[in-house]
Amino acid sequence: MINVSTGTAAVFGLDNIKMDVAPTTGYLMLGGRCVMDCAFCAQARSSQASALKLSRITWPEFDESQTLAVLAKAVERGDIRRCCLQVTVAEGYFQRTLEVIRAVRGTCNVPVDAAILPRDMAQVEELLAAGVDHIGFGLDAAGERVFQRVKGGNWAQSVSLIEDAARRFPGHVAVHLIVGLGEKEQEVAEVIQRMHDLGLIIGLFAFTPVRGTRMEDVSPPPISTYRRMQVARYLIANDLARVGNFTFSTAGQLLSFDLPPLPEILADGVAFQTSGCPDCNRPFYNERPGGMMYNYPKPLTSQQTKAAIEEFEVLI
């Protein structure tokens, strides 16, 4: 058996649900209840959330052979352009991940990514040798202070492995950052710059409270904060600016990008779309349909772009 995100299951024809936007990546979850204890995660060791939850998404179980067969058909139709494995740190998780990578690669010609916590560089090498296109590290926190509070573990060791992997395997390493864990905006922007300088792909997420987790009563970030971080990521990732160009308050809030043609740069709306690996649009991973859109899963209309620019509330 294997867990499949609800949206992916609908694209595969395994579930009959109505979707506003379909995922362009097939998302599969491996592992089970995690030995790690991230305060925000539904799969954390102390979490009381449903075992079928990750963020606000439900991941029902399906027969693995059937899932791989319908994945192949979805790839042939052009509905799915990438497969991403969401892996929890459970018993046997690493070998299980290698097995599924090889099974997917042996079934269809689709790039496979893995959001996983490798133990060391040897495991990074094994994942890439098995056929992984990108390894996604869930750094999540923008600095040691927040990392220790919401994730625990060794910040320096975690960052060192990410940076070493990026240097050794350029173009094959991604990092996930969550806005809204208690960090300052300046900390997020500085980590984005640090990761970009090493060539990492940066996927930005908005904190989403999940019932049953230790952070269930914490509010999501203000949309203005998230928009500023989206713009910062977009400018840095596209080498249009560096964090040193930005102006921050003494409290660490981003006040100005100091980039005169900013409205023109942002006019296509791409800055506000889901960021991360190619073809990863994660529909409604951080949002409820009809609610506030943190990450747009498809190109924005001109009206949506105009609204998003107004939402980030900085001097432009």
What would you call each of these model-derived segments?
Residues 74-75, 104, 127, 165, ...:
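Generic structural signal for hydrophobic
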